[in-house]
Amino acid sequence: MTLDSTMACCLSEEVKESKRINAEIEKQLRRDKKDSRRELKLLLLGTGESGKSTFIKQMRIIHGSGYSEEDKKGFTKLVFQNIFTAMQSMIRAMETLKILYKYEQNKANAQVVREVDVEKVCTFEQPYVNAIKNLWSDPGIQECYDRRREYQLSDSTKYYLTDVDRISKPGYLPTQQDVLRVRVPTTGIIEYPFDLENIIFRMVDVGGQRSERRKWIHCFENVTSIMFLVALSEYDQVLVESDNENRMEESKALFRTIITYPWFQNSSVILFLNKKDLLEDKIMYSHLVDYFPEFDGPQRDAATAREFILKMFVDLNPDSDKIIYSHFTCATDTENIRFVFAAVKDTILQHNLKEYNLV
């Protein structure tokens, strides 16, 4: 065998090996591509306090491992802090709104609660329990609570304050509902992946306050579905960041921006009109027409009000070919979210069958 033929033989072996390696790489790339397509990215968007974090908690309860006793213990301090934060907000509002306490001793109780550094709260003991119970039962504080649209107050206030006896018992362990109701503003980006029918759903929650939104841009690649949350009950409220701007108008402006982004051209859009329970309560005394004069439906009618709000959002869609899927929700109601997400999952899978190699 000549040197040339030996070299040719070696070369052909090298070429063969190179081809084999390339083929293996190509095969792996195709496999990776197929696997990556079995992961669906769901982006949760909406303004602050629309219920995005509660929705993520529900996914953990419904499709994940839920909350163990140890997990729930971790929320104890946050529940206590939520109670103090709510009462301090109302005490400040009593002054701003010039509402008087009916019972003189509640001025002293208010002072006791006001002096607490909420960040350092990790227990809930006397004299604070009594002070908060007495304040909550004062007609002045109740009037202040009824006027909560005039200042910032957590939606969970009534839920916690009517249950102070249970929450202040020694050895208190938060219930699942207590965990769902805890308010902690989202800063940064929270991802929650869960597995459904061999497909990974990666839900991404980003902070809704204006200061958080500049971080969203990093999440915009390869989004399967936009899940946009609107709080139905915010039609008469103003922003935390700006007390002369209506929260629902802000939500509409954000939704209009999101659905026209080129990034989301191929993403399905699912609109959750959340806090339907709070709307049903609020619509009885706060009239939609006072904030949206174009509303010409009957007063105290939650069904008409929510359909009007839905239409306002759907009408913002400039693309007649793009369907906006919508659901009325109550994010603190596990059974409601279980039912709604089953429908959402079907929508997402139908929308992505071919694209994600699921057929």
Swiss-Prot record:
GO cellular component, one term: synapse
Region span, G3 motif: 201-210
Binding site for Mg(2+): S53, T186
Residue spans crossing the bilayer: none
CDD domains named among the record's database cross-references: G-alpha
Keywords: Cell membrane, Cytoplasm, GTP-binding, Hydrolase, Lipoprotein, Magnesium, Membrane, Metal-binding, Nucleotide-binding, Palmitate, Transducer
Subunit details: G proteins are composed of 3 units; alpha, beta and gamma. The alpha chain contains the guanine nucleotide binding site.
Annotated localization: Cell membrane; Cytoplasm
InterPro entries referenced in this protein's UniProt entry, alphabetically: Gprotein_alpha_Q (IPR000654), Gprotein_alpha_su (IPR001019), GproteinA_insert (IPR011025), P-loop_NTPase (IPR027417)
Region ranges (G1 motif): 41-54
Keyword Hydrolase included in the entry's annotation: yes
Region of interest (G2 motif), residue spans: 178-186
Protein function: Guanine nucleotide-binding proteins (G proteins) function as transducers downstream of G protein-coupled receptors (GPCRs) in numerous signaling cascades. The alpha chain contains the guanine nucleotide binding site and alternates between an active, GTP-bound state and an inactive, GDP-bound state. Signaling by an activated GPCR promotes GDP release and GTP binding. The alpha subunit has a low GTPase activity that converts bound GTP to GDP, thereby terminating the signal. Both GDP release and GTP hydrolysis are modulated by numerous regulatory proteins.
Pfam families: G-alpha (PF00503)
GO molecular function list: G protein-coupled receptor binding; G-protein beta/gamma-subunit complex binding; GTP binding; GTPase activity; metal ion binding
Region called G5 motif, residue ranges: 329-334
UniProt name for this protein: Guanine nucleotide-binding protein subunit alpha-11
Family: Belongs to the G-alpha family. G(q) subfamily.
Reaction(s) this enzyme catalyzes, per UniProt: GTP + H2O = GDP + phosphate + H(+)
Lipid moiety-binding region (S-palmitoyl cysteine): C9, C10
Entry binding sites for GTP: 46-53, 180-183, 274-277, 331
Organism: Xenopus laevis (African clawed frog)
Keyword Glycoprotein: no
